[in-house]
Amino acid sequence: LDRGLVKAPLLVQTVFGILGGIGTHPEDVAHMKRTADRLFGDQYVWSVLGAGRSQMQIAAMSAAQGGSVRVGLEDSLWLSKGILAESNAQQVLKARQVLEGLSVEVATPDEAREILQLKGGNQANF
C-alpha cells in the first residue's frame, strides 16, 4: 500500500484448520484479526475460511468481530457434527442462519460481488 503497488481496500482472507497451519481456537482467530488491524489499519476487508468441522464456528467468530465469511464444500464437507452437507447452497443457508442469529446483516449476492469487485458469472467469458 505504501509503495502504491496495490489499492485499498485489500481483501485479507485468513484460513483456519488446515493441517500445518493456524488452528481453530477463538484466540487464533482473534490473533489474525489483531495482526491484520496492526498491518493494514482500516484499509482492508477481513474474511475467514474455516476448514473442516470448524467451518461454522469460525464463521461465527469472524462475524462477531466484524469480518466476512466464506463457506462451501471446497472448504468443508460437513454441515454440522456428523452430518455431511449435500450442497454449497445448504452450507450457505446454514451460515446465513448462524449470522442472522448473531444479528449480523448478510450481503446479497450482488452486494457480495460488489464487495469482492467481481463482475458476475453472466459476464464471464468461460
Where are these regions (language model features)?
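Catalytic alpha/beta core domains of metabolic enzymes, predominantly
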Residues: 1-73
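Structured C-terminal cap/extension of enzyme domains
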Residues: 34-38, 57-126
